[in-house]
């Protein structure tokens, strides 16, 4: 495990909303570490370093926690982000062991350009995989280079990294290539919208 994913975690002794606010004010993220039949451990991890790891390695980042001088490898299982201020409010961390398999949702990234006159619709932003806990892919790439209208890519067509297996429905639609709207289509939609807008005041006037 790279040192860049190492965090010094402090065991929490205070709980509740007030304690969580104080921790965040002091630059810490309240977290719970659980798994493998162990009692949950309540921790604080440094928010700046934790956020940097998530930016670099995604939401399934694997961490090496230093807890009272002892190392524990953990998977970032879930992160709660403040909807307005965009800071990390809380994290759930899962204890993992070497050689263990875990099920995670991995982001799907579309690459390339489809044929001229097409529009690429991505129907699934993530796909569920089972992978080695220490070798979780940060993303799955799907190339749409040169694809024509009517082409669909399903989950079972994804190229998965070695050791990873699909857990999602094999028929899950990932990408759908459709015809791009023409200028005439857009003008027609605009005209219909304007007609509906104009009709609304007329109907209100008739009722009054």
Swiss-Prot record:
Keyword Ribonucleoprotein on this protein?
Answer: yes
Which Pfam families does this entry report, sorted A to Z?
A: Ribosomal_L25p, Ribosomal_TL5_C
Alphabetized, the UniProt keywords read:
Ribonucleoprotein, Ribosomal protein, RNA-binding, rRNA-binding
| Gene Ontology CC annotation, any one | cytosolic large ribosomal subunit
Compositional bias ranges of the Acidic residues kind: 185-195
Q: Which SMART domains match?
A: UreE_N
Write out the GO MF terms. Answer: 5S rRNA binding; structural constituent of ribosome
Q: Where is this region: Disordered?
A: 185-208
Biological process annotations from GO:
translation
Composition bias type Low complexity, residue spans: 196-208
Q: Which InterPro entries match?
A: Rbsml_bL25/Gln-tRNA_synth_N, Ribosomal_bL25/Gln-tRNA_synth, Ribosomal_bL25_b-dom, Ribosomal_bL25_C, Ribosomal_bL25_long, Ribosomal_L25_dom, Ribosomal_uL5_bac-type, UreE_N
- Asked whether the UniProt record includes rRNA-binding among its keywords, one would answer yes
Functionally, this protein is described as follows: This is one of the proteins that binds to the 5S RNA in the ribosome where it forms part of the central protuberance.
HAMAP family, from UniProt?
Answer: Ribosomal_bL25_CTC
Query: Family per UniProt?
Result: Belongs to the bacterial ribosomal protein bL25 family. CTC subfamily.
Record's subunit section: Part of the 50S ribosomal subunit; part of the 5S rRNA/L5/L18/L25 subcomplex. Contacts the 5S rRNA. Binds to the 5S rRNA independently of L5 and L18.
Q: By what name is this protein known?
A: Large ribosomal subunit protein bL25
Kindly list the organism's lineage: Bacteria, Bacillati, Actinomycetota, Actinomycetes, Mycobacteriales
């Amino acid at each position: 495990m790279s040192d860049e994913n190492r965090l010094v975690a402090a065991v929490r002794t205070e709980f509740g909303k007030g304690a969580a606010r104080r921790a965040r004010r002091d630059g810490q993220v309240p977290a719970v570490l659980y798994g493998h039949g162990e009692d949950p451990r309540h921790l604080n991890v440094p928010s700046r370093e934790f956020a940097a790891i998530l930016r670099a390695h995604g939401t399934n980042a694997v961490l090496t926690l230093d807890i009272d001088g002892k190392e524990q490898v953990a998977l970032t299982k879930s992160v709660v982000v403040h909807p307005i201020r965009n800071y990390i409010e809380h994290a759930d961390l899962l204890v993992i062991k070497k050689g263990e398999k875990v099920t995670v949702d991995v982001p799907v990234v579309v690459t390339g350009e489809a044929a001229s006159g097409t529009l690429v619709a991505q129907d699934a932003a993530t796909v569920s995989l089972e992978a080695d806990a220490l070798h979780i892919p940060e993303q799955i790439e799907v190339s749409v280079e040169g694809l024509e209208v009517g082409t669909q890519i399903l989950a079972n067509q994804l190229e998965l990294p070695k050791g990873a297996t699909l857990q999602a429905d094999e028929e899950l639609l990932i990408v759908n290539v459709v015809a791009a709207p023409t200028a005439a289509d857009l003008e027609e939609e605009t005209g219909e919208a304007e007609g509906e807008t104009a009709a609304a005041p007329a109907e209100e006037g008739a009722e009054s």
